[in-house]
Each structure stands twice: as C-alpha cells, then as structure tokens.
C-alpha cells in the first residue's frame, strides 16, 4: 500500500481513521473507521455522492458509529502503547480500491475508488449498504454526474469536480427561484450585450460604469430575459454562471492548485459548447489573481479561450479599475467589447424604484407611498453627490423601510412610557409598604389607585399593539404567499403545465388577492382610529434619512425650527450689534435656502464682509453657525493669511500627484466633504495670494470644486463668508451724523476692492457688505453683551453682576477706540472689571448668591457687594 499513489483526501481520511481508532481505544484500524471519517467531512466527495443518491447521511453515519462501538476497546496495562495495527479487511479494501482506479484509468486512488471498494465488502457494512439501497451501479451513476468524464491525474482531483457549483452560482436558476429582484429599464444596454454575445469571435462584453449604476443588474436582466425566452434563438436555453474569484483562490495552498481549479471551470464551460455564459463581476480581479513566482494569473489563462470564442464571458468593472488594470494589458483588453453603463436619470430611477417597491414591501412588511419613491430619487440626486443613482436612491428606500420595520417590532413610545411609570410606582409602593406613619399610608393608597389605573391602560394598549402587529404580519404573510404563487405560475407556464397554470391563475391567486385586499382595507379603516404603529413609508422618512446621512436639513420644518428661522434676524442682531444690513442679508439668504427656493446649483449665499477691525465681521459668521447648527464648531474657518504664497493653494484642495500629502486631501475640500452643510469663513482674504482666488471661482458660481484626487466636492449647501479690512480707513472717516456710511466713502471702498480683486471673482459674490464703525450707543449694547457673558460664567455660583449707567459711560469712554472697534473694550472690561471681581472672589468678600454692582467713584471703577 503506497500512500504516494493516493490522493490527498484519501491520505487525510486514512490518518483521520487512525486518530478515530486511538480515541476509541481500539488496537486496530478497520474499514468502519475509514467509512466514518469519509462521512464526517461535510463538503467531502463521499457526502456529495450519497446526497445525489438521496441517502440519509446522518442515519448512515449513526449506523457506522454503532458498528464502531461494537468493536472491542483495550485500556489499562494490557494496551500496547503507541502500537496500532491495520486489519486485513482494510488492506483488502485498499487493494480493491487500487483495482477500481485502474478500471477507470485513473493515476491515483481517490475517495470514489474507496467507496466503490466498500460496495464489495461483506458482513456488517454490506448489510448497512443494503439497508440504505447503496449498490455499485447506482454509486457509479452518481459518481458520473459529479465527476463527468474527468480522470484522476493529480493528488487533489476533488477540487475539479462540480467546479461550477463550487466556485460560483447560476444566475438563471436564481431568477427561476425568485432570488433576484426584477430589473427595470436598461433595455439598450441589455440589447448591446446580446448583440456582442451573438458574434462569432470576441463575443465577450464588458460592462463599464461608475459604482452603483447597475452593471450587475444588467446581467441579472439578461438572465431574466433568458428565463422568459425573450432573447434571440442563439441565446435560448443558455445559463449564466457568476464566477466567484475569491472562492477559486481561497484555500489553494500548493503551487498549481489555483490553476487546476480555474482550468476545471473553463473545461466545464468549454464542454457545454457555448451553453454556459461566464459572468465575472469585478473583472479587474482576474489580472494578477493566483499569480505567484513562476505561475500564470487568471487573465492569461482566459486569453486564448476568449480570442477563439470558446468562452462567452461577460465582465463588469468600474471605469477607474478598467483603466488601472485592464487597459494596461492590451492583449486582454482587445478581447473584450466595451458596453458603457451610464447613470440613469432621476425619471429612470423613479421607474426602477416603482418596479422594486413590491419586493421591499413584502420583505419589510410596510407600505411605501409613491411620494416616498419620488422623494428618494430627487433628494438623493440633489444632496448625496459622491454616490450614483439608482444605488443611493434604493439605499434610501431600504433604510426608510427598515426604520419603520424596527418601529413595528419595538414597543411603541406611549406604551414604553406607561410601562416605565408602572415600574417606578411599584418600586415606590414597595418602599412605602414598609412605612407605618399616617402620611405614608395615605400616599400608598393614592399610589395604588394610580397604579391600578395605569396597569389597566397598559394592558389595553398592549392588547391593541399586539392586534395591530398581528394585522401587519398577516398582510405581510399574504403578500409573501401571493409572490410565491406568482412565481409558481411563471414556472408552470414556462414548463407548459397548463392544468397547474389554470389552477393558479383562476383559482388560488384571485383568492389570495381578494383576502389581501380585505386585510388591507381593514387596516385602512383601523387607521382612522388612534394607531400605535405606523406602517407607511412617506417622503418625511426619506427626508429624515437624507438629513441623517448628510447633515443637511431637508425634512419638513417642524414648528420650533419654523419660529427659529423667522426669528433668525433677531437672534443674530442680539449678538452682532449695530450691523443691521449685514444681519438682514445673511438671514434672508438662509431663509431662501430652507424654504427651498434658492438656486440649487449655487451655494446658499456668498458674502464679502468689509469693514474696520473689531466691528463684528467674524462674530457674525460665528453667530450664524451657532444659530443654524447649535454649535460654533460647525463653522469651517480658514485663515487666509496662511495662504500668502502661490503654491499654498494646494493646501486648500490637496497636493498634486507625486507630492507629499497627496493622499490626505485638501483642508477645505475634506472639511466640506465631511460636513456638506456648514458655514465657511475665509478670514482676512486680502492677505492671501491673488492666485488662490482662482480656485474659489467654481465654488462661488457652480457650488463645486474638483479636488486633487479628481473628486467633485459639493458646496451647494454652504454659506461662504469672506472678511477683509480693505478700505477701512475710508469707512472710519466717512460717517454721516446718524452713523451711516457716506456714499463717496462707499465708492472709495468699492474702488479699492476692485483694484485688489479681479472682476470675475467679485462678480460671483452674492453681496458685498460694508460694516460701519460702531457708534457710542452701539458700544453700550456691546458692554451689556460682555457683562451678560460674564454673568453666564458666574451663573453656577448664583452671583449676579450689574454695571450702573455711570460705570457703562466710564467703560465706553475709557475702553473704546473707533479705529480698533470693540476688541479693546473687551480687553478693558477684562482688565478693570473681571480682575477686580477675581480679587474679591479669592479674598472671600464675594460669596455664592451675592449681588455685585460695579460703579464709578473718583474716576475709578469700584465693586460693591450686596
């Protein structure tokens, strides 16, 4: 018995049989041990052959195990350590297996030869095989269906048996089983694929398109047409086999094993004489797949068959990967014919979603409104810019359905609140039960009354919830049943089983449809009452998912947000004092955007704020971010003084290829990709190099920038604010009596601005807003604001701070300089008021819950504690 004449799997089985004998304390390895180890391997050849013969594997295994238990076991001092004998029966079996291999003209003894040898066994195994109707003839018959007319010429032949079933899936069979969603549209692409497949040579289409546009769906559409026989004569009765490259490569430990597996797949396809169409999704994976030193990759193995037309192959890959992998190998590229899969339009996407609607409704057990489908297509196209239709729209609908489904399966909020309240009262009841005083007993009686009422409410709500859930599940089950019957009808019509088709079409299907209609009508009538569960997916759910994905508020305005937006101007004016024009223009731009009437291809608003230092330019941007997003952190702030050199522009959009930092992306583009709805503040723009502004032209006009990686970054949902001190000298000198800016000063400032920036840049900005220098009255308002902020910092200690009118006048007089704006005032309050308060706090003069008044005495600020 030469182990080298056996295949790897046979050797492994003999080794396992030895281990099994040792574990049972047997002195010898017998045929039953070997048979048991062959049946133990779930994916093994023996199991596959017996399954083809409809043998109950578990029962057979149990029978063999009983035979093993009958064998004598030796333990203790009588057992010879480390010695194990092979019985004569096992040796005879392996000799017979060798003869079977010779009969089949095989070079190695494989598992199937051992099985054939088992059929000639006498004794217990023979009786067991008879009980399960296992004979040599039907074993040979099953073996031929698994192995075909292949010979065993290597030590691992099992890998090449049933190669197609093992390394991929049959799309046509999946369509027949109803596992593939319907494909809507894409007729021109499917027709082009059919035309290429009908050619004599180079009949290999490759579908190229962006990720998510439906390349795989086109092939699934072709499979559906083949099932419906809606294809030319040459493609009828064909099958599409989707190759799984990862399954081919996985577990190929030895050199040549991968090539052996692939060759087995190709041979089976070749033998089918064009009946099998090979589909390789992610076609670029064949370039370099299985390539090791001195070995061939999958691409090179496919080339000869592709060129001769022996292999009908459909590939699918993205544009980038086609360019990166396939185009670099011209010999491979010329064997494929390109079919470009374009992104469908919004209208086409709506049609696709309408076709998939029923599938989603059945799977999730919900109802999808048509408005939700339209909203998913329109909103995904408008707001999710880095992905492609129809994939992103389908994802939106799927997630919205899943949201409603989880709500149906979870306890309703109203019932949850009542249940928690009951639990809380029960804990209180247990605590009060231990108390003996009159007050506690009275409270206990009141509590018990409330508890019994709540329990009654909870039980009725729970019953209502269970009933609603039951109704929803009933509708879902009926829909699933109807779907199954329709699939059976298609199958019956395809097989010309007219009796079954008539029974389904005129009997079962109408009955289920009627029952479903009644159940849905009952559900619709119940909706008039106060329902705990909702099963509708409307456009609100879709808008909510879009907002969750992108951070852009597209959901309908709730009452609180409505009021907030209408009061936006007032909110901004409270923090930015004395700049009514600027506040009004900015809040109007935001209102237009939230009302949905802004130009969808431009940013929400783009502004240049001009004015002297310290008048509220940067403060307005911060306030806007705070008002819109409840956080100043949502503001993307870029100090343009860092962009004084010409080459610094690459920091905004990312370094070009070949430079350090290319992979990292740009400071501006990456920030906006992560937060598409934000306020962008470009501070001190006149400090930047003029070349930097060329990059901003597209951002201001079309609301987009292409970064160094070639990705388009969407700025359509941003507010762009640029601040500058240009012309501040003219603004300081040119004020009217009422504090407004003189017309000639305005002209001088605009002239200076035009001299510094190019016309094409200024022409793209929505508004150029001049901030006027602050007057004394406005400065008093700013003093109040600074004191209010100080008050906020002391609020947790309940200390109030108040400045008398005289103190305010004194602070304004001493701390305000028109040239420097409000900043020196803040520093003055910090130095003169906050420092004095800090001294008193540390000294202990000011304690918690104190009232502090700041006044002026002898031309100096003093602190009084009350």
UniProtKB/Swiss-Prot annotation:
It is found in: Cytoplasm. Residues 3-149 form the Clp R domain. One of its GO terms (biological process) is protein refolding. ATP 2 binds at residues 611-618. Residues 162-343 are annotated as: NBD1. Residues 561-773 are annotated as: NBD2. Residues 6-71 are annotated as: Repeat 1. ATP 1 binds at residues 209-216. Keywords: ATP-binding, Chaperone, Coiled coil, Cytoplasm, Nucleotide-binding, Repeat, Stress response. SUPFAM superfamilies: Double Clp-N motif (SSF81923), P-loop containing nucleoside triphosphate hydrolases (SSF52540). GO terms for molecular function: ATP binding; ATP hydrolysis activity. It comes from the Bacteria. The keyword Transferase does not apply. Residues 86-149 are annotated as: Repeat 2. The keyword Cytoplasm applies. Signal peptide: none annotated. Part of a stress-induced multi-chaperone system, it is involved in the recovery of the cell from heat-induced damage, in cooperation with DnaK, DnaJ and GrpE. Acts before DnaK, in the processing of protein aggregates. Protein binding stimulates the ATPase activity; ATP hydrolysis unfolds the denatured protein aggregates, which probably helps expose new hydrophobic binding sites on the surface of ClpB-bound aggregates, contributing to the solubilization and refolding of denatured protein aggregates by DnaK. Belongs to the ClpA/ClpB family. The Clp repeat (R) domain probably functions as a substrate-discriminating domain, recruiting aggregated proteins to the ClpB hexamer and/or stabilizing bound proteins. The NBD2 domain is responsible for oligomerization, whereas the NBD1 domain stabilizes the hexamer probably in an ATP-dependent manner. The movement of the coiled-coil domain is essential for ClpB ability to rescue proteins from an aggregated state, probably by pulling apart large aggregated proteins, which are bound between the coiled-coils motifs of adjacent ClpB subunits in the functional hexamer. NCBIfam families: chaperone_ClpB. This is Chaperone protein ClpB. The lineage of its organism: Bacteria, Bacillati, Bacillota, Bacilli, Bacillales.
């Amino acid at each position: 018995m030469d182990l080298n004449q056996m295949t790897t799997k046979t050797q492994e089985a003999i080794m396992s049989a030895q281990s099994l004998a040792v574990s049972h304390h047997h002195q010898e390895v017998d045929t039953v041990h070997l048979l048991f180890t062959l049946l133990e391997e779930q994916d093994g050849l023996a199991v596959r052959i017996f399954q083809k013969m409809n043998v109950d594997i578990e029962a057979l295994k149990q029978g063999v195990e009983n035979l093993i238990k009958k064998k004598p076991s030796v333990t203790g001092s009588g057992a010879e350590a480390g010695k194990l004998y092979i019985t004569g029966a096992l040796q005879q079996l392996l000799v017979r297996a060798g003869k079977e291999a010779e009969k089949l003209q095989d070079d190695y003894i494989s598992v199937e030869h051992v099985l054939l040898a088992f059929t000639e066994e006498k004794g217990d195994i023979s009786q067991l095989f008879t009980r399960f109707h296992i004979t040599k003839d039907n074993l040979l018959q099953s073996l031929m269906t698994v192995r075909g007319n292949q010979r065993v010429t290597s030590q691992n032949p099992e890998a090449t048996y049933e190669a197609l079933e093992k390394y991929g899936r049959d799309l046509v069979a999946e369509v027949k089983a109803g596992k593939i969603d319907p494909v809507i549209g894409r007729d021109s692409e499917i027709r082009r694929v059919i035309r290429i497949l009908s050619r004599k040579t180079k009949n290999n289409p490759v579908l190229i398109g962006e990720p998510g546009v439906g390349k795989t769906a086109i092939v699934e559409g072709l499979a559906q047409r083949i099932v419906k026989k809606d294809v030319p004569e040459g493609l009828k009765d064909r099958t599409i086999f989707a190759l799984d490259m990862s399954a081919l490569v996985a577990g190929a430990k030895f050199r040549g094993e991968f090539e052996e597996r692939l060759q087995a797949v190709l041979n089976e396809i070749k033998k089918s004489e064009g009946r099998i169409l090979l589909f390789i999704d992610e076609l670029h994976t064949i370039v370099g797949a299985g390539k090791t030193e001195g070995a061939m990759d999958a691409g090179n193995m496919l080339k000869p068959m592709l060129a001769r037309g022996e292999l009908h192959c459909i590939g699918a890959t993205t544009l980038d990967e086609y360019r990166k992998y396939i185009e670099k190998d011209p010999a491979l590229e010329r064997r494929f014919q390109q079919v470009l899969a374009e992104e469908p339009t919004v209208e086409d996407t709506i049609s696709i979603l309408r076709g998939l609607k029923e599938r989603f409704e059945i799977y999730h057990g919900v109802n999808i409104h048509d408005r939700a489908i339209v909203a998913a297509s329109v909103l995904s196209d408008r707001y999710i810019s880095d992905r492609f239709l129809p994939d992103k729209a389908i994802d939106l609908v799927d997630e919205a359905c899943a949201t409603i489904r989880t709500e149906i399966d979870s306890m309703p909020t109203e019932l949850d609140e009542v249940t928690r309240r009951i639990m809380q009262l029960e804990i209180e009841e247990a605590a009060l039960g231990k108390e003996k005083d009159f007050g506690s007993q009275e409270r206990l009686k009141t509590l018990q009354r409330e508890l019994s009422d709540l329990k009654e409410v909870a039980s009725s709500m729970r019953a209502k919830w269970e009933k609603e859930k039951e109704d929803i599940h009933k509708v879902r089950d009926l829909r699933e049943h109807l779907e199954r019957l329709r699939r059976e009808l298609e199958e019956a019509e395809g097989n010309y089983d007219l009796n079954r088709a008539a029974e389904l079409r005129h009997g079962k299907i109408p009955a289920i449809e009627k029952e479903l209609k009644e159940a849905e009508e009952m559900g619709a009538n119940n909706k008039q009452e106060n329902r705990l569960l909702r099963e509708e997916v409307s456009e609100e759910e879709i808008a909510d998912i879009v907002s969750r994905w992108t951070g852009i508020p597209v959901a309908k305005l709730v009452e609180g947000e409505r009021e907030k937006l209408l009061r936006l101007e007032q909110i901004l004016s409270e923090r930015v004092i004395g700049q009514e024009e600027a506040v009004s223009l900015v809040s109007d731009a935001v209102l237009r955007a939230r009302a949905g009437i802004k130009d969808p291809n431009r940013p929400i608003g783009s502004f240049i704020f001009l004015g002297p230092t310290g008048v509220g330019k940067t403060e307005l941007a911060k306030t806007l971010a705070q008002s819109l997003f409840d956080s100043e952190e949502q503001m993307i702030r870029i100090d343009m003084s860092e962009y004084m050199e010409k080459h610094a522009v690459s920091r905004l959009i990312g370094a070009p290829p070949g430079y350090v930092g290319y992979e990292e992306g740009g400071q501006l583009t990456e920030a906006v990709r992560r937060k598409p709805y934000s306020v962008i503040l470009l501070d001190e723009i006149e400090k930047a190099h003029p070349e930097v502004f060329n990059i901003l032209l597209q951002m201001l006009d079309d609301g987009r920038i292409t970064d160094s990686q070639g990705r388009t970054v969407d700025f359509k949902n941003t507010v762009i604010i640029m601040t500058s001190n240009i012309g501040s000298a003219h603004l300081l000198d040119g004020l009217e009596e009422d504090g407004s800016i003189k017309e000639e000063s305005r002209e001088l400032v605009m002239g200076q601005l035009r001299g510094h920036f190019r016309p094409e840049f200024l022409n793209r900005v929505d508004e150029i807003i001049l901030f006027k220098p602050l007057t004394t009255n406005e400065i008093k308002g700013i003093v109040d604001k600074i004191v209010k902020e100080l008050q906020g910092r002391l609020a947790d200690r309940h200390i109030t701070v108040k400045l008398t009118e005289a103190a305010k006048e004194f602070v304004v007089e001493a701390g305000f300089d028109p040239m420097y704006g409000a900043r020196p005032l803040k520093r003055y309050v910090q130095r003169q008021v906050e420092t004095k308060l800090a001294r008193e706090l540390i000294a202990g003069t000011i304690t918690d819950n104190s009232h502090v008044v700041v006044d002026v005495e002898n031309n100096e600020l003093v602190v009084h504690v009350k």
